[in-house]
């Protein structure tokens, strides 16, 4: 049944793409990316207006109506199928159906820390409530303000049936495949010798730029809800789609929803959307379709402005207006308000530092941290310490991308196309420097000191650009490998003579794509074991998560819908608590700690979210328990449990420190928990009383 629910979403997407292709002239290989982007844009606006559920129904009904319209109007037409099924669209629909069935059979689960703390949890909350996760009541003290693009994309594929982790991966992988289709969007059927190896290259991209060691654990590529890879793919896919649209003389507006989606994935990759918009706008504005710069300058200028308006509208509506409201609401509800410096002030003061101008206050204190971050990032780029891809450090990645651009320029059969590719390559290189500056500013003035010292998650942040940059370079190469027709006009008295020349790229450049595909597949085969990848993972990879979820389902069966759970997981580093928040929902798991704000400095201090609970004098000298030790007296813990409105304590893990510290708070001195008789204690006036339950099913 759940498989049919997802296939219904795929069928609705197909109907929408058919309308775009047969009625709106959008190429079949570009239509999936445009359709998915438009769906996310509609759902985002509807969710912000509080009408997500009816809007989703309306989208499905419109897709169905569009499919009926297309089927009725194209009955008996012999050209419809040929327009719908091109090399790019066949690649997309084949992979979409294959992965839908494959993931339904294999049932992968969310396991990574950030999936449980944000990405997968956001999707589950959106599905359960049929509303934005950012407005949901949670046990966490902070407002969830991450962009809703990906969770709402997953919501579209989760709409029918029950929530399931694997449906997230289906939705996100379908987005991946829509980008792949866009890259080969302009390749005709007779160019299969280009399309096939290009598809192999595209398959390798998510692996190639995110893995750099031999696998000894499961690599979650194609099985993750993180936003870093999608951000890079959509950034590059927008430019690749644009190149294919121009090559096919298709409607240019089809790229605008893609640019909007690029701005709706992650807040810190909004700059990638601006880069994509800039590359598209410059290509449109500088290179007129007929070669006459002055002709049609005003419409080209208007479209260039629209390219920037699409992502900036999303940024303003969500990141400025909506997030501003969420943060102020969280602060007024005794939660956490604004927790980082304003972006505009960060940019201004960072540039002042680079120009040698003095800065004051917070920025003067962080100047050394900013400069150190820049130095460390340079070290990661230039030296072998920076293992960021399957071919090593950043300089190697940039060299590979430069080679692809160079081959594309050489392969292009017309001077105009050579110039367009050269401009895109040069500008994307300049933007790469700007993106690195943005990362340095983030480490210097937004992230915490220890994060800057360790360049925490630097590889995830930088490979978003590398992936997008490589994808748009492949898009340039795909267009360059197509035949180019140049038209020359010569005056002959009162008449004009037009001469058209069809130029074919040399076979050697097509061979380059094959060599690139073989090289990337070979390198991937060296580092990624099939049994530790999406293509061959063992069911045992998710044994622990299945056990955790089974325990959560057992515990929830003994709870009331309005219960609020205090989490006790001794020795936890926070991951167990996030897992409980995810698995228990819609039953709320409390932050299980305190949130205090210094009235003088405004600094917020949060103690909770898992960790070791115990008396101050019992804190271990070292180890995980020392690092995540939350020291409370017995009276303080009792006040926290009751003050936070908790009705039940969930004893996930017990140890001697907790028993020695807080046994007197429990009516049975924790005897039932120690004997394995229960995992739950009800908060009563007399103390925390054990709840009878069958724990043998764990």
Predicted regions span which residues?
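Membrane-embedded, lumen/periplasm-facing catalytic core of multi-pass transferases
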Residues: 511-577, 697-698
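Hydrophobic/aromatic-rich transmembrane helices and adjacent perimembrane loops
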Residues: 124, 173, 225-235, 265, ...
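Membrane-embedded, hydrophobic transmembrane alpha-helices
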Residues: 1-84
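Membrane-lumen/periplasm interface segments of specific transmembrane helices
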Residues: 106-110, 153-156, 285-286, 297-408
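Perimembrane helix-loop-helix junctions
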Residues: 67, 71-83, 272-308, 590-594
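Short periplasmic/luminal acceptor-recognition loop of GT-C membrane glycosyltransferases, typified by
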Residues: 526-527, 552-610, 651-654
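Active-site lumenal/periplasmic loops and adjacent helix-entry segments of GT-C-fold
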Residues: 98-199, 220
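Membrane-interface alpha helices of multi-pass inner-membrane proteins
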Residues: 41-47, 252-267, 271-278
